């Protein structure tokens, strides 16, 4: 068995409290992901649980991170909690369409399904 790779990251990068700690004062919010990716090699995108990301935003994620960076996306709560995993084909298609700029790269990691209790 070959050794695995351990990655360290956080659930998101858009935290104002990180100004002056991770993000230098004066660094615009549009550059936070790039700075985050200088320190960590993976991130969980929690926002996709609450709303679909735009294709433009996903393209920016890809461009702002180094080649070996990895994204873990949360599946939509609409599919999991509201639809209760029933008739979710169209929703999965919309999700896949939005994340396509990421999915076609090696930066695409797991899609996390936060199931209800």
Q: Locations of the language-model features?
A:
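Residues lining hydrophobic/aromatic ligand-binding pockets adjacent to catalytic sites
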Residues: 1-117
């Amino acid at each position: 068995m070959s050794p695995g790779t351990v990655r360290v990251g956080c659930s998101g990068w858009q935290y104002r409290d990180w100004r002056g700690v991770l993000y230098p004062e004066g660094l615009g919010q549009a550059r936070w992901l790039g700075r985050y990716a200088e320190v960590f090699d993976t991130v969980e995108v929690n926002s996709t649980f609450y709303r679909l990301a735009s294709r433009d935003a996903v393209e920016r994620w890809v461009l702002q991170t180094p080649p070996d960076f990895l994204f873990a996306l949360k599946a939509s709560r609409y599919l999991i909690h509201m639809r209760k995993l029933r008739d979710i084909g169209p929703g999965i298609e919309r999700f896949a369409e939005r994340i396509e700029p990421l999915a076609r790269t090696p930066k695409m990691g797991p899609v996390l399904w936060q199931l209800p209790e």
